[in-house]
From Swiss-Prot:
ATP binds at P95, M96, G97, G98, G99, I100, G101, G102, G103, S104, S105. It comes from the Bacteria. InterPro entries: GHMP_kinase_C_dom, GHMP_kinase_C_sf, GHMP_kinase_N_dom, IspE, Ribosomal_Su5_D2-typ_SF, Ribsml_uS5_D2-typ_fold_subgr. Belongs to the GHMP kinase family. IspE subfamily. GO terms for molecular function: 4-(cytidine 5'-diphospho)-2-C-methyl-D-erythritol kinase activity; ATP binding. Pathway: Isoprenoid biosynthesis; isopentenyl diphosphate biosynthesis via DXP pathway; isopentenyl diphosphate from 1-deoxy-D-xylulose 5-phosphate: step 3/6. Catalyzes the phosphorylation of the position 2 hydroxy group of 4-diphosphocytidyl-2C-methyl-D-erythritol. This is 4-diphosphocytidyl-2-C-methyl-D-erythritol kinase. GO terms for biological process: isopentenyl diphosphate biosynthetic process, methylerythritol 4-phosphate pathway; terpenoid biosynthetic process. Pfam families: GHMP_kinases_C, GHMP_kinases_N. It catalyses: 4-CDP-2-C-methyl-D-erythritol + ATP = 4-CDP-2-C-methyl-D-erythritol 2-phosphate + ADP + H(+). It comes from Pseudomonas aeruginosa (strain LESB58).
Length: 282
């Protein structure tokens, strides 16, 4: 009998993003604050014994072998020496290029699912180290706790912060992270701050002015949302968000936005819904 497992891949928000400088290797030193949303993709896994890794859901513009889900599965297979394979199906709800972690979250869910399915017994640090090879945002998803991040985003300090409801607007654009970080007008000299300063409200997203200038759709979404709540870009975008004390208020503002704007309302969470689900597994 085959072993099956279904797990969520939650979205995240960058509640702020400060860029401190550029390193010699081209990567940027940054500080950010990650919090999860109770909203995301869903992945379904079925173990197979012939060692093959197959993703049965096509993603437009992403070749099968380049998909982070496949790369995560094969990377874990190689690193662990497991002879097992897997069939994977993806229910895609999170946008690509949205700044809410869709690809990184899918990769993290794949690593944790296969650690369970293949009975590898890897600990959190080992999985996070493998995840970092796939992308700087993957470890925050494998660890599953809201975190203050430094370095290129891989140095994580868990935090316990308020868990409001969020209204997230999804402009219909695919923002290129590489393009934003290479923009000559990007602020790269923000001073380092303490997480307490962020909670007191002294923060911003250094990428936001560049994204607004390059992507009118994002600028327009921010203008519309700012009429009702203080709005901000998450990551390099293009999703923008505002926070609310309860679902009713978030839903009320959502109903006032133009019909053409794609959006969703979700609860913020300091423990990802993926990790809450994993805790229920035997």
């Amino acid at each position: 009998m085959s072993v099956r497992l279904s797990l969520p891949a939650p979205a995240k928000l960058n509640l702020f993003l400060h860029i401190l400088g550029r390193r010699d290797d081209g990567y940027h030193e940054l500080q950010t604050l990650f919090q999860f949303l109770d909203h995301g993709d869903e992945l379904h896994f079925e173990a197979r014994q012939d060692g093959q890794v197959r993703l049965h859901t096509e993603i437009a513009g992403v070749p099968h072998d380049s998909n982070l889900i496949v790369r995560a599965a094969r990377g874990l297979q190689e690193a662990s020496g497991s002879p097992q394979g897997v069939d994977i199906w993806l229910d895609k709800r999170l946008p690509m290029g949205g700044g809410i972690g869709g690809g990184s979250s899918d990769a993290a869910t794949t690593l944790l699912a296969l650690n369970h399915l293949w009975q590898l017994g890897w600990d959190e640090d080992r999985i996070a180290a493998l995840g970092l090879r796939l992308g700087a945002d993957v470890p925050v998803f494998t660890r599953g706790r809201a975190a203050f991040a430094e370095g290129v985003g891989e140095k994580l300090t868990p935090v316990d912060i308020p868990e409001p409801w969020y209204l997230v607007v999804v402009p219909q654009v695919l923002v290129s992270t590489a393009e934003i970080f290479s923009d000559p007008l990007l602020t790269r000299d923000s001073p380092a701050i303490k997480v307490r300063t962020v909670l007191e409200g002294d923060s911003r997203n250094d990428c936001q002015p560049v994204v607004e200038r390059r992507y009118p759709e994002v600028r327009n979404a921010l203008i519309l949302l700012n009429k009702f709540v203080s709005a901000r870009l998450t990551g390099t975008g293009g999703c923008v968000f505002g926070s609310f004390p309860n679902k009713a208020e978030a839903d009320k503002v959502s109903a006032l936005l133009p019909d053409h704007l794609q959006r969703f309302v979700a609860k913020g969470s300091n423990v990802s819904m993926l990790h809450r689900k994993l805790e229920t597994l035997v």
